[in-house]
């Protein structure tokens, strides 16, 4: 209940001592009263403490070499991309700390360096971003660029990306404003041509323009209930200037653009180096000009100054992914069966066959789990009920479906 000035009995705030005539409202509780001014003060103190906690969490950002070490525990291969990401993430949070602690007289303004990751499906783009966010203990959200539309069209507004980050941060705005957002499949909203279209491009340039605003840094109005179905809802203001955006895509066919550019240079200058070599890695040669030619607007490219190119994973890479990282799939399934007191072994040839299947299906690392699930289905179904089974051995023939796994009993 609340009391106001019409009450005959004078009531005082238990915290500041003011009476109901000196404040707008006093709220009664169990044997205590609090005025609206003390409520507002308490809220402000809580907000300040939350900001301090967020800043304290990021005050000692791991050095690039430490971030690389963390990534190496979970991500196999992609050494150049991991180095680029480690440096970019370290500099990003160092920049935030600089802005939070610098004197007003300092005129150096460190600008944000968002990241563009280019690499084939299943090469580890999402997992890299996810691992970085987890290692820094910052909120992380994933968005699919193909689901976005510009304002006024049916689809998801770009502001909903920020809503996802807020949800992960339990609507702690200060914490969300220092999070990481990964926007996947940015290549799917590339312009259909380099020429500016007179007509509206719902799934291409318009979405890129909308993304540009939040990526470069703006105060965005985020609908807490999402979408456009609740026009009367009170918006949440989120400042995106300190949110790190990592944008990724496969960019299928961009190698041809790179080859064409390098080939022209060869003709023009008489060089006969890696531009002619079909076996060279053109992904590492990508520059802003190639990305623009692919269909990404130059303004957006300018807000993504850090390029991290990921290579197609080889059979050897995939085999290592299966067994080496801390969360390797082989270790996960061994742990699952260990709860039934059963050991699980994979022959080297079996792991090679799983990797070959993933490459044939063009699914990369993300397809490994589904292949193991197919291989392990009967084992996971039958073995828990067979008390005498102590070891399961997966062979190449088990993976290709020509034979059953080898079971050893007690």
Swiss-Prot record:
GO CC aspect terms: HslUV protease complex
What the entry lists under Gene3D superfamilies is as follows:
1.10.8.60, ClpX chaperone, C4-type zinc finger domain (6.20.220.10), P-loop containing nucleotide triphosphate hydrolases (3.40.50.300)
User: Matching InterPro entries, A to Z?
Assistant: AAA+_ATPase (IPR003593), ATP-dep_Clp_protease_ClpX (IPR050052), ATPase_AAA_core (IPR003959), Clp_ATPase_C (IPR019489), Clp_protease_ATP-bd_su_ClpX (IPR004487), ClpX_bact (IPR046425), P-loop_NTPase (IPR027417), Znf_CppX_C4 (IPR010603)
Q: Which UniProt keywords apply?
A: ATP-binding, Chaperone, Metal-binding, Nucleotide-binding, Zinc
Chain positions recorded as Zn(2+) binding sites:
13, 16, 35, 38
Q: In what residue span(s) does the ClpX-type ZB domain sit? A: 1-54
Q: Please give the biological process terms from Gene Ontology that the record holds.
A: cell division; proteolysis involved in protein catabolic process
Q: Which residues bind ATP?
A: 120-127
Q: Acetylation as a keyword?
A: no
- Which Pfam families would you find in this protein's record? AAA_2, ClpB_D2-small, zf-C4_ClpX
Free-text function comment from the UniProt entry:
ATP-dependent specificity component of the Clp protease. It directs the protease to specific substrates. Can perform chaperone functions in the absence of ClpP.
Q: Which family does it belong to?
A: Belongs to the ClpX chaperone family.
Q: How does it assemble?
A: Component of the ClpX-ClpP complex. Forms a hexameric ring that, in the presence of ATP, binds to fourteen ClpP subunits assembled into a disk-like structure with a central cavity, resembling the structure of eukaryotic proteasomes.
Record protein name field: ATP-dependent Clp protease ATP-binding subunit ClpX
Organism equals Streptococcus pneumoniae serotype 4 (strain ATCC BAA-334 / TIGR4)
């Amino acid at each position: 209940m609340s009391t106001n000035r019409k009450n005959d009995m004078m009531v005082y705030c238990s915290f500041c001592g003011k009476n109901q005539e000196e404040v707008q409202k006093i709220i009664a509780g169990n044997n205590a009263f609090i005025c609206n001014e003390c409520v507002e003060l308490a809220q402000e103190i809580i907000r300040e403490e939350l900001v301090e906690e967020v800043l304290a969490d990021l005050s000692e950002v791991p050095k690039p070499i430490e971030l690389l070490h963390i990534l190496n525990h979970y991500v196999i291969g992609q050494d150049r991309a991991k180095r680029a990401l480690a440096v970019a993430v370290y500099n990003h949070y160092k920049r935030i700390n600089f802005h939070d602690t610098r004197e007003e007289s300092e005129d150096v303004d460190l600008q944000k360096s968002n990241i563009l990751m280019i690499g084939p499906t299943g090469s580890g783009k999402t997992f890299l971003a996810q691992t970085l966010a987890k290692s820094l203990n910052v909120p992380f959200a994933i968005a699919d660029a193909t689901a976005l539309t510009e304002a006024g069209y049916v689809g998801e507004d770009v502001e909903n990306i920020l809503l996802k980050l807020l949800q992960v941060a339990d609507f702690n705005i200060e914490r969300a404003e220092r999070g990481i957002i990964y926007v996947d499949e940015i290549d799917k909203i590339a312009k259909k041509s380099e020429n500016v279209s007179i007509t509206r491009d719902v799934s291409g340039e318009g979405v890129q323009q909308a993304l540009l605003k939040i990526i470069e840094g703006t105060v965005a109005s985020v609908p807490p209930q999402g979408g456009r179905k609740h026009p009367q809802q009170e918006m949440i203001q989120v400042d995106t200037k300190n949110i790190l955006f990592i944008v990724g895509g496969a960019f299928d066919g961009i190698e041809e653009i790179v080859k064409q550019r390098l080939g022209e240079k060869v003709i023009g200058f008489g060089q006969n180096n890696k531009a002619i070599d079909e076996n060279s890695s053109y992904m590492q040669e990508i520059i802003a000009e190639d990305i623009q030619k692919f269909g990404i607007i130059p303004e957006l490219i300018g807000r993504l100054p850090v390029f991290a190119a990921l290579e197609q994973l080889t059979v050897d890479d995939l085999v290592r992914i299966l067994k080496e990282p801390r969360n390797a799939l082989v270790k996960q399934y061994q742990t699952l069966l260990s709860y039934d007191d059963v050991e699980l072994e994979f022959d080297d040839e079996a792991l090679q066959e799983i990797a070959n299947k993933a490459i044939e299906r063009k699914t990369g690392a993300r397809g490994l789990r589904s292949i193991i699930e197919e291989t392990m289905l009967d084992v996971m179904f039958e073995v828990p009920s067979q008390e005498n089974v102590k070891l399961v051995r997966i062979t190449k023939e088990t993976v290709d479906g020509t034979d059953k796994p080898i079971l050893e009993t007690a």
